[in-house]
Amino acid sequence: MSSILTSTVTGIDAIKILINNTADKIINSKYKDEIKHNVFVENTVDESNFNAGVKIKKIYDDYNDFLKEEKRKISERVQDEQTKIEEYLKLEDLFGEKSNIFTLLINQLYSSIENDIVNNHGNVFNENIENNLNTIIHELKNFDEKLSFLERDVKESIKEKIKQANILINKIYDTNIDIRFFPTAQLPNRIDSFIDKRDKLIDELNDIIGVKVIKENSTFKVCLNNGMCIIDDYNKKNLMTLTSDTDDKYISVGYFDDNEQRLKKIEHMIPSASLGALLTFRREDLQNAKNKIGQLTINFADSINSVHTLGYDILGNIGKQVFKISNPEIISSSQNQSYLPTSIKWVDTADAQDTNYIVFLKNNHWTVTRLRDHSVVEPDIYQQDNNTYITFDGIEFKIEGNDAEGNMYMIKPYSKTLNELELLIIKNDLFSISSSDDLNQKNRNNAIKIQHLHQEKIVNKKETLYESYLRFLKSISYKCNDLEEKVPFKRNMIEILNNKKLSESDDMYENYQNLNYEQKCYLANVKVLKMAETIFDEIVDCYS
């Protein structure tokens, strides 16, 4: 029986192995007929002479704590994925609603150019063409407004989540104090209600920011998943909403470091649960959506500008630009060692990418990184008159003077694109119809070239405007559908783990009076293993 004594916590590891490996084994049909129960034996028994009942209770406590931890991990993922689904659906609806811009409206524009200029030999931007151009601009600006509204909505949701998290942090801290100073000796059966209350509050906090509980000796800690402690027996850290005076859409999360006496941003420490999902959606998915619309707008407007300014009107004058297009935005890091004059402009929008950039000087070498996928771009760099010119993805970034080591700049190509997009022509302005300025050899070749732009692969030189738009819309739908398939199984996992708590009788003497110590440990361990098998079987049934 002594060997049983040294393996009383076997069931804890058995549970862990079963839960961690079950899904993979079931998904892979190769293993369907050979699912095995793995049991790892670990010597965790303390041979000191404290009460045997306490030792046995620890078997149940370790099992129950493990179960709570697993439920919280799954619940955290469910909240993360459910929050993303809700935001993806909003974004998908918006892109679906506005798809007519890159189908119906743009086709109407090019059809009016074909009919009024090419076929009917018109020579000016008539009312029909002007209206079509203005309608496209109006719809693009409305698209931008709705994206901004969605961004503000996400910002308010983030604020609310931080507020809820702080309420829970305060309640958990206060409840933990009640537990620490509870008169257990006088009221031995009353403390469990306080512990249950604390557990429920931690469950709620976990769904918002993702946490783990650490119990060491007599101490109790609640930490973020990266290990930063936010609640212990003596202190708590409340979260703070970080906003910007210069950008009303910016929001992040941080806390006040008492040791360093300053605010610290911790957005990267909360990568999941509902708050992490909102922060990620705002930082990545919303930004990618805005950049994609900005890229398509630039490609559309500048493709017309480029062709129109190559041709000639009926009087032999070179064509003028049709649209006003804004240049990218430069944001200098607040940590830069020097502040030199900078400027930026588009030099070839055909190379425009749907991403923001970080431009960084390290070891006297300029590095350009696309933030969409963190790929590094090798820029073209040249010096002239003590100025540095850095060209990448159709953008030319100019720095006047010698920049300092470590200086960093963020480049946002489309932050002002939709807001500042303007039509530069008015009704009856001359259309650049001809490829020749010879009045005796006038033709309609330039107008025909503009008319065919809607068929050209002008996005990354491999997609039409609509193809690129549709691919982005499908990527949103795919991510949403993928999560919608995963969430139900995870919810079922939570249900499976519910009500699987194990405990011995409250009357320790009555429960064990006829058993020796080894037998008590053995029976406790058998109960844990039996429950492990029950959980295992329910997971199999769930996936069958």
UniProtKB/Swiss-Prot annotation:
Keywords for this protein: Bacterial flagellum, Secreted
Single Gene Ontology MF annotation: structural molecule activity
Its main localization is secreted
Q: Which GO terms describe its biological process?
A: bacterial-type flagellum assembly
One GO CC term of this entry? bacterial-type flagellum hook
Please give one Pfam family short name.
flgK_1st_1
Give the UniProt subcellular location, in the record's own words.
Answer: Secreted; Bacterial flagellum
What is the similarity comment for this entry?
Belongs to the flagella basal body rod proteins family.
Q: Provide the protein name.
A: Flagellar hook-associated protein 1
What is the organism of origin for this protein? Buchnera aphidicola subsp. Schizaphis graminum (strain Sg)
